[in-house]
Each structure stands twice: as C-alpha cells, then as structure tokens.
Amino acid sequence: MEKGFFTFREYMKKDDCQLTASMEDYLEMIYRLSRDTAFTRIHDLAAALNVQPPSATRMVQKMADIGVVNYEKYGMIILSKKGREIGEALLERHQIIEDFLKLLGISGSVLEETEKIEHTISSHTLDCIADFVQFFKNKPDLIHEFEIYRKTKGKSV
C-alpha cells in the first residue's frame, strides 16, 4: 500500500485552495456569462446554475470576500483580475475533461460526469489528459480505431 494514504477530504486540503467545489462552479459560470459583457447579474447566474437568487447572492458575497469578484447588492457581478484568471482556468479544465470523456465515447450525461471529475483532479493529471486528448485529436485514424475496438467489445461509442 502506498505510504501517506489520506481520506479524500485530506487530499483536497493539501491543495491549499480557498475555493470550494461550489465556488468553482459559480466562478466558472460567472466567467462564461461575462465573457462578452464583462459582467453578469444575480438573476442570470442563478438561472444558469438552476439555483434560487438568494443562494446565488450568498455565494457571490462569499466570493467577493475572498477577492475573486466585485459585487454590490442588486448590482453587477464583475470578476476581479484574479477571478478572471481562475475562471478562465476553470473553464479550460472543464473543456479538457469534457473532450476527454467524449473521446472515450462516454454515453449518458457527459456534463454530469465532467462536473463530478473536475473538482477532484490534480493539475498534473489534467495536463496529462490534455496531452492525451490533443494527441488523439491530431490522429483521427486512431480515434476511429478506438471506436471500432469499443464496438467489437460490445460497448456503445
């Protein structure tokens, strides 16, 4: 057995990140919603995340406290420089994982699977997955071979 085994919670504490998984979801969505206009509003954020506006308000206030957004009650939500950088990285992480799952031929809800994975993956593992996905994108013949392999195993592609 590998030395230094920890519970999931302890592994996540080691990352020394102030953002919870929920905060990451909110920050990623704020980034998505504000790419064109440089801001978003609580009602748009709440609708995009399928939460109630008071819940979105509480979370945005917490995020303002740690400096990733600027927000005044009933006003606009504007990402700070730090928030914009993190939001961009979170969206990139999401897209890499989603592309990876699609490449594998995951059936069902790729979005749901992506959400489950993205908050627990290390940056090193994400980098390796990004390289893997890029390698296969550059070799469509291998993707096709993989799809054939999956079909011969009786698995859907």
Language-model segment annotations:
Residues 13-51:
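N-terminal helix-turn-helix DNA-binding core of bacterial DNA-binding proteins
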Residues 93-101, 125, 136:
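Alpha-helical linker/hinge and terminal dimerization helices associated
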Residues 118-157:
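C-terminal regulatory/oligomerization modules of transcriptional regulators
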Residues 1-19, 157:
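N-terminal leader segment of winged-helix/HTH proteins
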Residues 75-94:
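Basic, amphipathic "hinge/linker" alpha-helix immediately C-terminal to the N-terminal HTH DNA-binding motif
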Residues 84, 98-102, 114-115:
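Amphipathic alpha-helical segments within well-ordered protein domains
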